[in-house]
């Protein structure tokens, strides 16, 4: 009898535990439903009058800043990563012009600022540079001047207000030893004067030959103060400080070449934009284990400053066969 009573009590406890567990599930469900009811009762459905009165943006018009940096005209490259010669240079510039046409149309650009950011020629400053060259330095200058003039003339088809600014790069030094070089005595400094004569009959194109210094310059694009340099004497991290101290006023945008790859960073509120190269990966870059496609940068400027930046690829990456 005692064992039966003990067994009965055990079963009663089991039943109570099961009932408690079941009730807990019911309580959780009830609480969840209560929370849903509370939320539903607290929410007021949207009414069209509740939305903000959005004022439609009216475009202020746009300028384009079209970079043309590090062509390295005269170089001959034939590697697994890149092929480059005069004909390929022409093809890449044609690709660039076509893409700029689309950008002009997309943003209804009213004016184009073309920045020649240096190293338009390959020069003869290093032994490996001289080995790569297919043309001597004078031929390189003439070829680059004609190709860049054609580039600007083609842009004129879609925009009749074009200003051209230029700075020389380190590859156009007259003397290979940079300690012997006189600032401003670079070979590619001749290119803007060639362009000025070549383009003189196209009203609306102005090739600027006066600048603050042979190594950097500046201009206004709508309301923005824009500075530019080749990049061999400055880095993206210090160029804002350097040039701000030189001009004694805040700078909105700085454009650099030299490093052969597109990029953008912000330093103290100033946008530093780097434009890549047209020549593509050379033996020097391969030695550093760096490889990228030929590329240039195009900036769209409105009255408020930089609106957008285009990463323009001039060619697809090479397929490496191992």
Language model regions located:
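Short, motif-level signal for alpha-helix interfacial/capping segments enriched in acidic residues
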Residues: 45-53, 96, 148, 234-245
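Short active-site segment of divalent metal-dependent hydrolases/proteases
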Residues: 73, 122, 261
